[in-house]
C-alpha cells in the first residue's frame, strides 16, 4: 500500500484557482495535494534581443521555491548570486513544454514570461508548475485577445505533466515527497492534450528499471494527463 493510501493510478486532489495575482496578465494557483505552486504570466511588448525583427514571439519561464516551502528553510538562491543547476533545468523544462503548444508566430514580437513560485513542496513541483503554467499562459493570451493585441488565441493544444515512479516494485502515479524520496525509479512525463510526448525524464534511483516498467509508467502518465487536461478545460471554460 502507498504511504498516501492511494491506488497505483490515483492522482492526489488537484485544484486550479485562476486570477489570484492582481497585476499579472494571467495567473493560476495550482494545488497537487500539499504541493502548491503559484504561476503568473507577464507580457512584455518586445521579444528577446536575439529574436527581434523575426516576426515571432517567445515564451519562457522562471522557477523558484519559497525558503520555507520545505520542511527546513532553504536559502533564497538570490543570496548565492545565481540559480542552482536544478532550478535552471526546471525552468527550461517549463519553457520548452509551453512553447511546444504555442504558435510563436501568432504572438507577434512579444514575450510572455511565466513565473512559477513553489509556496509549499510535497513532491512533483515541476510537473505541477507545468500544468498550472498552461492555465496562466492561456489567461494571458485571452487577456491579449480581449484587448485586440492578438486576433486569435495562439495555443495549439493543452499540455500537462505528471510524475510516476517505481515504489516497492510497483509502478505508481503522482508521487508525493514521502514516496518519491524512497522510490527505486523516478520519472516525469510531459504530454499534450492530443497525447503527443513533449518530454520524458526517467532515472534509476535505487535500482535499474525495465522497459516493461517504463511502459507501465507511461500508461499511468497518459491516464493522469487525460484527467489533468479535462481539469484544465473545466478551469478555463
UniProtKB/Swiss-Prot annotation:
Binding site for phosphate: 86, 124-126
Annotated InterPro entries: ExoRNase_PH_dom1, ExoRNase_PH_dom2, ExoRNase_PH_dom2_sf, PNPase/RNase_PH_dom_sf, Ribosomal_Su5_D2-typ_SF, RNase_PH, RNase_PH_bac-type, RNase_PH_CS
Gene Ontology terms, MF aspect: 3'-5'-RNA exonuclease activity; tRNA binding; tRNA nucleotidyltransferase activity
Record keywords, A-Z: Nucleotidyltransferase, RNA-binding, rRNA processing, Transferase, tRNA processing, tRNA-binding
GO biological process, one term: rRNA catabolic process
Keyword rRNA processing in annotation: yes
EC number(s) on file: 2.7.7.56
A Pfam family per the record: RNase_PH_C
Reported function: Phosphorolytic 3'-5' exoribonuclease that plays an important role in tRNA 3'-end maturation. Removes nucleotide residues following the 3'-CCA terminus of tRNAs; can also add nucleotides to the ends of RNA molecules by using nucleoside diphosphates as substrates, but this may not be physiologically important. Probably plays a role in initiation of 16S rRNA degradation (leading to ribosome degradation) during starvation.
Assembly description: Homohexameric ring arranged as a trimer of dimers.
Record family assignment: Belongs to the RNase PH family.
Protein name: Ribonuclease PH
Organism: Methylocella silvestris (strain DSM 15510 / CIP 108128 / LMG 27833 / NCIMB 13906 / BL2)
Record lineage: Bacteria, Pseudomonadati, Pseudomonadota, Alphaproteobacteria, Hyphomicrobiales
Gene from which the chain derives: rph
Amino acid at each position: 500500500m502507498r504511504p498516501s493510501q492511494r491506488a497505483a493510478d490515483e492522482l492526489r486532489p488537484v485544484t486550479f484557482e485562476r486570477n489570484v495575482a492582481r497585476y499579472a496578465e494571467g495567473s493560476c494557483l495550482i494545488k497537487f495535494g500539499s504541493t502548491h505552486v503559484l504561476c503568473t504570466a507577464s507580457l512584455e511588448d518586445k521579444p528577446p534581443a536575439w529574436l527581434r525583427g523575426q516576426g515571432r514571439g517567445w515564451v519562457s519561464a522562471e522557477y523558484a521555491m519559497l525558503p520555507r516551502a520545505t520542511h527546513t528553510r532553504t536559502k533564497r538562491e538570490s543570496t548565492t548570486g545565481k540559480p542552482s543547476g536544478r532550478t535552471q533545468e526546471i525552468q527550461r523544462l517549463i519553457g520548452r513544454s509551453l512553447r511546444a503548444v504555442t504558435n510563436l508566430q501568432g504572438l507577434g514580437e512579444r514575450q510572455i514570461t511565466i513565473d512559477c513560485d513553489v509556496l509549499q513542496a510535497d513532491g512533483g513541483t515541476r510537473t505541477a508548475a507545468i500544468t498550472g503554467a498552461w492555465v496562466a499562459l492561456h489567461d494571458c493570451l485571452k487577456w491579449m485577445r480581449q484587448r485586440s493585441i492578438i486576433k486569435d488565441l495562439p495555443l495549439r493544444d493543452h499540455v500537462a505533466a505528471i510524475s510516476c515512479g517505481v515504489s516497492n516494485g510497483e509502478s505508481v502515479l503522482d508521487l508525493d515527497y514521502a514516496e518519491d524520496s524512497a522510490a527505486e525509479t523516478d520519472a516525469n512525463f510531459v504530454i499534450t492534450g492530443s497525447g503527443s510526448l513533449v518530454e520524458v525524464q526517467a532515472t534509476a534511483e535505487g535500482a535499474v528499471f525495465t522497459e516493461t516498467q517504463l511502459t507501465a509508467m507511461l500508461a499511468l502518465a497518459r491516464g493522469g494527463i487525460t484527467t489533468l487536461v479535462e481539469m484544465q478545460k473545466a478551469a478555463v471554460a
